[in-house]
């Protein structure tokens, strides 16, 4: 499994998978829908799967002395790792922003502020994208566009919901917005819920994707 993961990183990861990690600094952009940052992580998955297809990596991997179900599992583990890194970076850089900027400049007028709740929201977005994209992709690894478009549409709809909640509910506009030092307990609960959703959805994603890939005739 470790060798498969190394192979994924060396041969299948598109450069954008690493470049887009630096987009976490977008939390310093004032009045910006920060959930968009996580869409770029989804976009890097699309580019990496395209690279996998163009390099004929699936057929190559199936010729290796490994279990067939380990092939999708290794790819997803690499993606999950990169997603956890972007979540961590957004949380850390958001905390730095809160420490160096005045409170009135920290509050985001275009959505939730760069706090723990944003990380929880991002975890939910990434988990849902994984659940939509990977099981469909591993049914037919040559067909990448449709699963990605469906996943992207759902992601942007959810981002719109998060933005609407920022203005429609006092929970999002007051309690969950602003600095982490304000209403910390509520923000931690939102973070834990988001991470829990991500873990559950990722586990389901792995199970469905591995099952679907077993049926692929290469």
Regions found by a protein language model. Give the residues of each.
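Juxtamembrane/interface alpha-helical elements of multi-pass membrane proteins
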Residues: 60-62
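Hydrophobic alpha-helical transmembrane segments of membrane proteins
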Residues: 1-58, 74-218
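Alpha-helix N-cap/helix-start motif at helix boundaries, enriched for small hydrophobics
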Residues: 70-72
């Amino acid at each position: 499994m470790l060798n498969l993961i190394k192979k994924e990183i060396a041969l299948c990861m598109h450069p954008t998978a690493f470049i887009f990690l630096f987009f976490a600094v977008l939390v310093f952009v004032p009045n910006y829908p920060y959930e968009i940052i996580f869409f770029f992580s989804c976009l890097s998955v699309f580019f990496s799967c395209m690279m996998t297809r163009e390099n004929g990596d699936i057929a190559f991997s199936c010729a290796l002395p490994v279990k067939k179900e380990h092939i999708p599992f290794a790819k997803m583990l690499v993606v999950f790792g990169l997603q956890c890194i972007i979540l961590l970076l957004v949380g850390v850089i958001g905390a730095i922003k809160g420490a160096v900027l005045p409170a009135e400049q920290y509050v985001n007028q275009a959505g939730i502020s760069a706090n723990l709740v944003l990380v929880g929201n991002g975890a939910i977005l990434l988990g849902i994208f994984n659940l939509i994209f990977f099981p469909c992709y591993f049914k037919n690894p040559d067909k990448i566009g449709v699963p990605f478009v469906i996943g992207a549409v759902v992601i942007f709809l959810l981002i719109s919901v998060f933005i609407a909640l920022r203005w429609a509910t006092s929970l999002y506009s007051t309690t969950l917005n602003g600095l982490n030092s304000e209403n910390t307990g509520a923000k931690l609960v939102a973070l834990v819920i988001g991470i829990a959703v991500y873990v559950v959805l990722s586990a389901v994603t792995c199970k469905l994707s591995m099952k679907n890939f077993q049926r692929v005739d290469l």
